[in-house]
Amino acid sequence: MSDSYDDFSLEKSKSQVKRELHALQDLGERLTTLKADLLAKLPLTDALRRALAEAPKHTANAARKRHIQFIGKLMREQDIEAILALIDQVDSSTREYNERFHALERWRDRLIGEGDSALEGFVELYPDADRQHLRGLIRHAQHEAAHNKPPAAARKVFKYIRELDEIQRGLR
């Protein structure tokens, strides 16, 4: 008698199955908001790619809801872990993205504040960095800071190190 009870406890309840299906629909809806270049990097089936491309065409509420449910159905066949890992890297609302963003801001501040000594450590982490170009951007940012000008060059430094980080992570 205990064997039948143990078998029953391993099955998912109807409520649990519904929660999982709704989670897949929510993930599918998040995918509809991603840009095409990011979608291309995700391991998705062709049917799901087509469904995601069609999603903006469905503007009526009922049609959109049905289409999101269809996307949720197609999501059952996907590698959800791989999709979530990539979304966490590029979605600005996730903790991982924010941590990486703040780390890059700290690098920018160190590079502008410390100059060449910080540049050596940065180049060790990012060997693809163009030292000469980065050194020029840093000097320009230091000059702007010394003369109380708007931080346009500091933004360029940040943009460049963010591009290097994305290249190293395989996002570009």
Swiss-Prot record:
GO terms for cellular component: cytosol. It is found in: Cytoplasm. This is Dual-action ribosomal maturation protein DarP. Its main location: cytoplasm. Member of a network of 50S ribosomal subunit biogenesis factors which assembles along the 30S-50S interface, preventing incorrect 23S rRNA structures from forming. Promotes peptidyl transferase center (PTC) maturation. InterPro entries: DarP (IPR006839), DarP_sf (IPR023153). GO terms for biological process: assembly of large subunit precursor of preribosome. It comes from Ectopseudomonas mendocina (strain ymp). Belongs to the DarP family.
